[in-house]
Amino acid sequence: MSSSPTVSWRETVQSYLDRRLLWVFMLGCSSGFPWVLIGSNMSGWLKDAGLTRAAIGYFGSVFAVYAINFLWAPLVDRVKLPLLHRSLGQRRSWIFLCQSFVLICTLLIAGVNPANNLMLTSALALGIAIASATQDIAIDAFRIDTFPKSDSSKLPQASAMAVIGWWTGYSLPGYLAFINADSIGWNGVYYGMAAIVALLMIFTLLVGEPTTRREQLQQEAEQRHNQLVGSKVVAWLTVTVVEPFLDFFKRNGVRVALTLLLFVFLFKIGEAFLGRMSITFYKEVGFSNEQIGYYSKLLGWGITIFFTLVGSMINVKFGIVRGLMIGGIAMAASNLMFAWMAEVGPNENLFLATLIVDNFTSAFSTVAFVSFLTMVTGQAFSATQYALLASLGNFGRTTLASFSGELVDYLDNWSVFFVITALMVIPSLIMLYSLRHYFHDLLEKARKESSEE
């Protein structure tokens, strides 16, 4: 089941001494930070403002844009932004533009009261979500362009640094928000968050734009389409909108492509339902904002970073597909720790133990998952194809999980809710096990194709 040659532990550790990994980390911070603004911070603010669990769950529907960002991903692959493209390049110009929009919306949110202006707050949160989802397209493409399949031995490391960056951008600001929310208020917190957005924009100016054959491959595709349709405008449109999806199915075959899409959709549904209700659960169990900030955000961040590095090393040494299987099983089992905590109550030792187990399993499975998605994308349309796969992976977290509050209310039992989330991963594990050899062959095929690109 291994998908990569065995290397020594020393070689594995030395492989992290690559400056490009720092770039991936810095942009990973930018990717994770908007989830603080419209995720955990907003959930805490809405709960303190007196909104119901169902309302908080439905507010999370703004995350649905992450599930459909592949629809405009072709524009990120092909459209060159005026002025910004010349100075920053294709990937960084889109990232910087999206960060600018996030900054504006964050400043506006800081000046409203969601209890009195829920519609305006929702609209601004939707604006952040759209900008963030678009930014993710460019950031993922930046990582894939920086570490192409010809550098496949570095995929787990790059995935790990992206995950570590994401959790750093999500957890550290989240920690600062929750420990200060009671003293300065949520409006003050969001003004502080705006300053962090400005810092992330500086990061974007510091990283280096990757050099790829993307434009050459796109021009070759455009010439082929131009010969077929006889129009440069139509050829540009078909290459931009249609070719990325045709390329994915041609490269993998229809049956395999559909199987991949279904597996990606199912793999993290249980984790999505758990994550959407976690802050509400912590508060209802009896933990304070300060405790949530310390354990869930600050300690959770450190635990995640450590286990992400461990998980990536294991994936480097033993293979991505095996890592997916182990991570999926552990991820399902870890959800049962939350069911235990629901029965025991606000026990800080159990809270810490649960976070350790949950962060380990989540980090391990995410590194393998991101590496796997990266391997099956093509270089010519990396932004569009990865966005399609990532959108499916996010669909449960961003759309179906909006009903998590309704499910908790219907069950009226947190323990049963968490047991159900543990069972949700089983279908994808069965699929992965039954097709494990086929997935291995697919990864090997993708690695060989790198020499052709």
Task: Label every model-predicted segment.
Residues R322-F369:
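C-terminal transmembrane helical hairpin of 12-TM major facilitator-type secondary transporters
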Residues V376-D409:
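A late C-terminal transmembrane helix in Major Facilitator Superfamily
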Residues S93-A115, I329-P346:
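C-terminal ends and interior cores of transmembrane alpha-helices
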Residues V65-W72, Y294-V316, G327, S334, ...:
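Transmembrane alpha-helices of Major Facilitator/SLC transporters
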